[in-house]
Amino acid sequence: MTQLAIGEATPHGATYDGHGVNFTLFSAHAERVELCVFDSRGNERRYDLPGRRGDVWHGYLAGARPGLRYGYRVHGPWQPAQGHRFNPAKLLLDPYARQVEGELKDHPLLHGGHDEPDYRDNAAVAPKSVVISDHYDWEDDAAPRTPWGKTVIYEAHVKGLTYLHPELPQEIRGTYKALGHPVMVAYFKQLGITALELLPVAQFASEPRLQRMGLTNYWGYNPMAMFALHPAWASSPETALDEFRDAVKALHRAGIEVILDIVLNHSAELDLDGPTFSLRGIDNRSYYWIRDDGDYHNWTGCGNTLNLSHPGVVEYACECLRYWMETCHVDGFRFDLASVMGRTPTFRQDAPLFAAIKACPVLSTVKLIAEPWDIGEGGYQVGNFPPPFAEWNDHFRDAARRFWLPRNLTTGEFACRFAASSDVFKRNGRAPGASVNLLTAHDGFTLRDCVCFNQKHNEANGEENRDGTNSNYSDNHGKEGLGGPLDLMERRRDSIHALLATLLLSQGTPMLLAGDEHGHSQHGNNNAYCQDNALTWLDWQQANRGLTTFTAALIRLRQQIPALTGNSWWEEGDGNVRWLNKNAQPLSADEWQNGPKLMQILLSDRFLIAINATLEVTDIVLPEGEWRAVPPFAGEDNPVITAVWQGLCVFQRG
């Protein structure tokens, strides 16, 4: 290998062209950048990057090939009060690294939040970037492009979903390979979901605090390398990318979309006591929101916040999204703590990153889902994201639970949430699909735990049960914990059925948490982010198959109702919806606000949802015509008057 040629400022990262590798690094405040390459024995050789175009440093290393391990040392001022923490003694990870060798350890040589620079070299313990080739044969792969009105999302963890599945080959359980295995594809099709939403698959690290307690970060919301697949779920780091793409291709062949949960709000460098391994040493001032005293704005609760209003960081974020789309053919993204994306530092719908996504012909055409809050002032932004974003609807989650469990919600409020929360999302030209309705998600109680626990039980997390929300709107039905007498178990079953039916028969885009369809419990832990064990792994052998069948029937029913699949707002007299009382008459103003929680919802003039959220069996009168109960609900073939137990029943006009 020779000295570096000047190379090109694009594409960003390390790019192999068949003859050598072009390297680039964004740093607006650096004074010098060294590329450091390592041989198989760990010997280091350094090269100055000779080119600079704007704020991008670049150079070309002829003869370099995939498999080369590298990093950067970045020279510049050490001025913590101004947000500058350059220290060439620290080897830094390429923010665009496609593969990483080594884990991020809790090691004093990696800590960079000191008042004075630590000049001890950290190359022996620092993770290294690895050059790869992106080539892959996609054959005839085509994106399913499921319309929002037909979309049913299934949120799952790569490992937890399949690690205990007895029908999968032992060696692929809990891996990317398992996602595309015929056993899993057949299950997804039988269930009826149209999109698999994966918790973060970009490489992440366990926080130093967890490492000291002997725990690990399981969920993955502590990003280390945003362009690299987490290697633990692959046969080897070298094969991770192809194994993931094989799974995407298999899922696409079955008509199932793949959505990635992506963390563009903070990095695993955490606060000033956290490790320095990349962005902090490359250009702290540009990559993060810095306070006047040089510390970080912590709008994420994770110690730092990415400055997604800076042009260089906006470009980084957009290239990250395009990489996953173009290299891995993913169909969309769910953005963690997405209000950070709109901070300038106040939240704006025309924030630079939003504008860049809207203007991008690639990014603006896929499914984009925001978790529409962060923990900073003004961070709660439900309903305020611009098109083409959809949003997690916590109004729906809380209302559904309050209606069926504590039973302290009006019929009017329930109906509003059932109708895709038009008061929140019917603006800026958005359709009902912008409301992503959920009962549960990875954070919080599972659905079974919602009906078994009144209090969280997070002691295993090592924080004396202080972590996790206390606002669960749950109901243990008279006994804390799993198990109980038959009548209690039946009441819990009825509540689960009512909640699932509400989720899957409401207007908007439903999201189902993996495991809720077969009764998975985390034993009351509502923040199992550090539990990589049987608490979070789905136990397929103990699955409630009756509940799975019930859920699948609901999804099939949903796809038959035009009022739900049309993805257009319901208007008075359009034939999509009528709201009736138990006597099949229009609900009065008093019944909306003060009446018993009894109602009938007529959809598309031929599907009737009879709802009884009281504790009494109630006679209801169905509208004129011949009606029959439809799967998964039992009932008479053509009743005119019927008794509805606590829960709901669906009828179809004959």
Curated annotation (Swiss-Prot):
SMART domains in alphabetical order: Aamy (SM00642)
This protein's pathway: Glycan degradation; glycogen degradation
Active site (UniProt): D336, E371
Coiled coil spans: none
Keyword terms of this UniProt record: Carbohydrate metabolism, Glycogen metabolism, Glycosidase, Hydrolase
Any one biological process term the GO annotation gives: glycogen catabolic process
Domain of life, per lineage: Bacteria
Site (Transition state stabilizer): D443
Signal peptide positions (record): none
Region annotated Disordered, chain positions: 459-484
EC number: 3.2.1.196
GO molecular function, one term: hydrolase activity, hydrolyzing O-glycosyl compounds
Catalysed reaction, written as an equation: Hydrolysis of (1->6)-alpha-D-glucosidic linkages to branches with degrees of polymerization of three or four glucose residues in limit dextrin
Gene3D superfamilies recorded: Glycosidases, Golgi alpha-mannosidase II, Immunoglobulins
SUPFAM superfamilies listed in its UniProt record: (Trans)glycosidases, E set domains
Biological function: Removes maltotriose and maltotetraose chains that are attached by 1,6-alpha-linkage to the limit dextrin main chain, generating a debranched limit dextrin.
Family to which this protein belongs: Belongs to the glycosyl hydrolase 13 family.
Protein name: Glycogen debranching enzyme
Record organism: Salmonella typhi
Gene name of this polypeptide: glgX
